[in-house]
Amino acid sequence: LGDSLGLSQEAGKTDARIIVFCGVHFMAETAAIISPDKKILIPALGAGCSLAESITGYELREWKKANPDGIIVSYVNTTAEVKAWTDICCTSANALKVVQSIPPDRKILFVPDKNLGAWIRKVTGREMELWHGDCCVHERITTDMILEKSRDYPQADILIHPESHCSHDEAILNLPQAYMYSTAGMIRHASRSDKKQFIIA
């Protein structure tokens, strides 16, 4: 049990030669990249992800042609083809540090998650070109939904993933009980907190 990269890393640590990856296609690809000597099986070959499917390697190649000095930063939730055209691959946990490490005179294309990119841009003030991709589930999590749940459960901590539509809205970010986390960070917070209720965005 874990997030996409965490599961792929666990696959790399095990002595098993065959890994059955119960997830979407890009996750199994990532496991295969990390463990090229192992056989990675996915039960449903057609299991897709709207975020990963929002961009292709061809589109990145064309951007690179037009911006030869630009830096492509891709979220780990991408296909192997997209990773191949990527300069730096990041996770939601280290995306801020990755963007901050790039010289200010270099143009950045952040792909494919527009919400994660918008949150990074808001926090760092760094101008970036954002791809217009999203997770179809996270995109439906709006500020109004979270504020309503917060009124219903006033004692609950709000744990926000930067993929969520509400992740770069001041109305949420300014709440004292709101925390921005990767999936693994959410799990850690919930396990260590004295709170009994959590709103997950």
How would you describe each model-predicted region?
Residues L1-A201:
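Active-site loop-to-helix "anion-binding N-cap" substructures in soluble metabolic enzymes
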